[in-house]
């Protein structure tokens, strides 16, 4: 064993061994318990960042730990390789997205190998390959045949100058990123999958996800948004037209003083034909930002359509207003407005001089709506002559009474609604999987026949930054179906499609079908899934939805795709900037910032860069290109080794919390590995050891062995049950401190050190696998560490021969005594009373009572 710890040599050697022996390639084996560990696969952007490294290190630690439990462990990797960044890079670099993507995959693959992640590379997938998206296209056609796919018009960002659709990321301050033209909203036909058909199951099955974070489950419940209410019909005065409104607060219906409809509602469009003010308002609404955040912040505006609605219970007329806070694609596109009991309605009514009527009062007081709406549930009053029996009812009683009345008159019905909308999967981009639908010459729309799949995306293209190459190339869309001329769909799939089923494809990545059911059902569900909480409501919901679709088509037999979910926190780093001559912020890398002053708590006060600019320190923030505060993993591995980077990542913070990057702490992790290496080297250099004779150990040796086996138990529990990897590492570090001070004089001292080091190396193997691999060999083992089991706790070693008892007099500490572990109260009392500190404080006093807490405390009450 070499004396010096040389990570670059060790890691290259061990990684070559793993590659040569295909250590992490696995097949189905019914005789072994399986464990499927999966980290969310990366987008091949060009280089790994520290967020990737944290995610994949956590996954690798879990996978390697489970391997040492004797399980058949699958840990695959691949590339989420379609998407807009590749198009933008292709435009900037005057190339096609495909070569840029494949070059990035090659580079990042080498980075992943450099970090020592134990992936089964034989299962590698890239979602941009026809071998992958062929089966996504096939699956879509099956969903269409089952009635789960439909086409309807939906709003998109449209650049009138370039005549092209823009992704949200390409809209900057309301303008096109390329030509700065004002972006407008345009309705175009798009494909949707009926996720709403599964809304109830998706919601109810959240209760099965016992090992998912509560925060993620709450976010999904809120996103699905189940509500119980009443849908009621309002007639339009002087017309046979009507419209429906859904409300979860039917108890307030007697307080409706106006109705608000979306600018895109047919009634608003119709009224605008003779109302230029309304027509102008509708045009203004077309170009509004309709994201939730924007809707919440925007000024609430509206225009009276001139139409009146007939209240379904009172028969009174209420005005119909077009309002910018109602969306046509949400609910029915119309809401009943009760300003007395809804704050938004209150502010709108106040602004436009509309009546405000109170019909709900607190159960224990008077109603006051002079300054704001009363929005709580309470007791109904002021219900009027048309339905006086509502007065005095509480919410539920009123709900039932109003439901009964509307149902009997055919004007409404009780209904369960969901906030969740169907999934629009069309994207007017090039770099995505073509949607496998065709339109025949006679206008018939149908799926691409199975024998024509995959519909291959041409990769040899030129990106002009304006139009998708497959939209620009009219010949590409032309095809033949059943002897007829047909035209292919030129939209591509939302890239969430690819990431919704990749986990299942890993089970049989080379199968000539979407999934091999036998293999999929061996590996699925995923036992441990790891990724960021930012995916809670999109990817993780589609991921669950697709699994249910796969189940219902007969490809898998489980209800949920993943048993356990860990959402790792972000990686933060110091961020610095200076302001240039034009007043713009120039962000400076932490590597180029020299701290010149700190306060008494060590916080940065002043810093300069290498060119002398005085820097503003903004604190720790998420590593990002925009703030130039990313740390290149390659640099850190070159400087300290992969094991050091991995150890720091796992030790610096609990996995679900943010991790603050501090190079001084990285250096600390490196020093710890060097200490371990030195301890092992010093031990090995003294030659072979004799067998450990537990029966002959003295008390100090027994105590050290007890600490060893306590540590084995704690580390296993911390990794498997608690997933507190940082405390597991801290326990090993504490044990290491004990081992470094342990005597090495006798044969049994060295035999005990051999047992301890063999255990420590296995405890650390999931975290620092290269170092552990090498040390395991150095400790005299022929079999490689991947093929051995996690150390077993010797329960007999945990049994203590003696106990330390705290001795108090009148509740104050006066002595500590060591007694036999099985000592009774009388023995402990005698030992305690003999202590000098106890004698001093009981002398001349009468002992009134002796309280003994077995194995812990003796309290003598004397006065």
Curated annotation (Swiss-Prot):
Q: Which UniProt keywords apply?
A: Aminoacyl-tRNA synthetase, ATP-binding, Cytoplasm, Ligase, Nucleotide-binding, Protein biosynthesis
Mostly located where? cytoplasm
Motif 'HIGH' region — list its residue ranges: 42-52
Q: Which GO terms describe its molecular function?
A: aminoacyl-tRNA deacylase activity; ATP binding; leucine-tRNA ligase activity
One Gene Ontology cellular component annotation?
cytosol
Q: Where can the motif 'KMSKS' region be found?
A: 622-626
Gene Ontology biological process terms, A to Z: leucyl-tRNA aminoacylation
EC number(s) in its UniProt entry? 6.1.1.4
Q: Which residues bind ATP?
A: 625
EC category name:
ligase
Q: Does the keyword Protein biosynthesis apply?
A: yes
Query: Which reaction is recorded as catalysed by this protein?
Result: tRNA(Leu) + L-leucine + ATP = L-leucyl-tRNA(Leu) + AMP + diphosphate
Compartments where located: Cytoplasm
* Record-linked PANTHER family: LEUCINE--TRNA LIGASE, MITOCHONDRIAL (PTHR43740:SF2), LEUCYL-TRNA SYNTHETASE (PTHR43740)
Concerning its family, UniProt says: Belongs to the class-I aminoacyl-tRNA synthetase family.
- In Swiss-Prot or TrEMBL terms, this protein is called Leucine--tRNA ligase
Q: Which organism is this protein's natural source? A: Shewanella loihica (strain ATCC BAA-1088 / PV-4)
Task: State the organism's lineage.
Answer: Bacteria, Pseudomonadati, Pseudomonadota, Gammaproteobacteria, Alteromonadales
Encoded by which gene? leuS
């Amino acid at each position: 064993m070499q004396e010096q710890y040389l990570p670059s040599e060790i890691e290259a050697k061990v990684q070559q061994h793993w590659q040569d022996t295909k250590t992490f390639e696995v097949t189905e084996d019914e005789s072994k318990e399986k464990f499927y560990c999966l980290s969310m696969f990366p987008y091949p952007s060009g280089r790994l960042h520290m967020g990737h490294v944290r995610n994949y290190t956590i996954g690798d630690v879990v996978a390697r730990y489970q391997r040492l439990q004797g399980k058949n462990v699958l840990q695959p990797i691949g590339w989420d390789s379609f998407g807009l960044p590749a198009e933008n890079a292709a435009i900037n670099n005057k190339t096609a997205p495909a070569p840029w993507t494949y070059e990035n995959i090659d580079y990042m693959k080498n980075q992943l190998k450099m970090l020592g992640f134990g992936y089964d590379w034989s299962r590698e997938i890239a979602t941009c390959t026809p071998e992958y998206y062929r089966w996504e296209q096939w699956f879509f056609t099956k969903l269409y045949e089952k009635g789960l796919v439909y086409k309807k018009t939906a709003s998109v960002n449209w650049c009138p100058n370039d005549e092209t659709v823009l992704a949200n990321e390409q809209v900057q301050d309301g303008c096109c990123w390329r030509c700065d033209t004002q972006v407008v909203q345009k309705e175009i036909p798009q494909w949707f999958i009926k996720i709403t058909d599964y809304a109830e199951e998706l919601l109810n099955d959240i209760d099965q996800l016992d090992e998912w974070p509560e925060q993620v489950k709450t976010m999904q419940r809120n996103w699905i948004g189940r509500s119980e209410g009443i849908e009621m019909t309002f007639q339009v005065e002087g017309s046979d037209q009507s419209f429906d409104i859904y409300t979860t607060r039917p108890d307030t219906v007697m307080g409706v003083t106006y109705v608000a409809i979306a600018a895109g509602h047919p009634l608003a469009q119709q009224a605008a034909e003779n109302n230029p003010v309304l027509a102008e308002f509708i045009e203004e609404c077309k170009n509004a930002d309709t994201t939730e955040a924007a809707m919440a912040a925007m000024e609430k505006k509206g225009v009276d359509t001139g139409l009146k609605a007939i209240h379904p219970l009172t028969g009174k007329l209420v005005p119909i207003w077009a309002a910018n806070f109602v969306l046509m694609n949400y609910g029915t596109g119309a809401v009943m407005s009760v300003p007395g009991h809804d704050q938004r309605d209150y502010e709108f009514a106040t602004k436009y001089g509309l009546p405000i009527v109170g019909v709900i009062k607190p159960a224990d007081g008077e109603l006051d709506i002079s300054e704001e709406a009363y929005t709580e549930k309470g007791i109904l009053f002021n219900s009027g002559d048309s339905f006086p029996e509502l007065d005095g009812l509480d919410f539920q009683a009123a709900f039932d009474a109003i439901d009964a009345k509307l149902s009997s008159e055919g004007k409404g019905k009780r209904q369960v609604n969901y906030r969740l909308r169907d999934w629009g999967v069309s994207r007017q981009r090039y770099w995505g999987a073509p949607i496998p639908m065709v339109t025949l010459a006679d206008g018939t729309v149908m799926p691409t026949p199975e024998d024509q799949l995959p519909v291959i995306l041409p990769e040899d293209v030129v990106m002009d930054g304006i139009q998708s190459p497959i939209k620009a190339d009219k010949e590409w869309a032309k095809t033949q179906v059943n002897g007829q001329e047909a035209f292919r769909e030129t939209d591509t799939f939302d890239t969430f499609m690819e990431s919704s089923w990749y986990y299942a494809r890993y089970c049989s990545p080379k199968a000539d079908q979407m999934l091999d059911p036998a293999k999929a059902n061996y590996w699925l569900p995923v036992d441990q899934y790891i990724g960021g909480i930012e995916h809670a409501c999109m990817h993780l919901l589609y991921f669950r939805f697709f699994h249910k679709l796969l189940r219902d088509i007969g490809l898998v037999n489980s209800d949920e795709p993943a048993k356990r979910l860990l959402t790792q926190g972000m990686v933060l780093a110091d961020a610095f900037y200076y302001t240039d001559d034009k007043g713009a912020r120039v962000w400076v890398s932490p590597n180029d910032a020299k701290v010149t002053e700190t306060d008494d708590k060590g916080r940065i006060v002043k810093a300069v860069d290498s060119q002398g600019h005085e820097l503003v320190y903004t604190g720790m923030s998420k590593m990002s290109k925009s703030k130039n505060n990313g740390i290149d993993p390659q640099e850190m591995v070159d400087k300290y080794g992969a094991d050091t980077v991995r150890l720091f990542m796992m030790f610096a913070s609990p996995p679900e919390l943010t991790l603050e990057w501090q190079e001084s702490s990285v250096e600390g992790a490196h020093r710890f590995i060097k200490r371990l290496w030195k301890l092992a080297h010093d031990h090995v250099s003294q030659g072979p050891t004799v067998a450990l004779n537990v029966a002959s150990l003295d008390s100090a040796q027994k105590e050290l062995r007890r600490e060893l086996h306590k540590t084995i138990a704690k580390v296993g529990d911390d990794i498997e049950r608690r997933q507190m990897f940082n405390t597991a590492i801290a326990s090993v570090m504490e044990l290491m401190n004990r081992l470094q001070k342990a005597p090495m004089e006798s044969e049994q001292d060295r035999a005990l050190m051999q047992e301890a080091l063999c255990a420590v190396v296995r405890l650390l193997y999931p975290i620092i696998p290269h170092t552990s691999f090498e040390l395991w060999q150095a400790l005299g083992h022929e079999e490689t560490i991947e093929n051995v089991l996690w150390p077993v706790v010797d329960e007999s070693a945990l049994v203590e021969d003696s106990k330390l008892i705290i001795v108090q007099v009148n509740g104050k500490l006066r002595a500590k005594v060591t007694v036999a572990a099985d000592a009774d109260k009388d023995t402990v009392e005698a030992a305690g009373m003999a202590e000098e500190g106890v004698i001093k404080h009981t002398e001349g006093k009468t002992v009134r009572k002796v309280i003994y807490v077995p194995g812990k405390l003796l309290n003598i009450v004397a006065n």
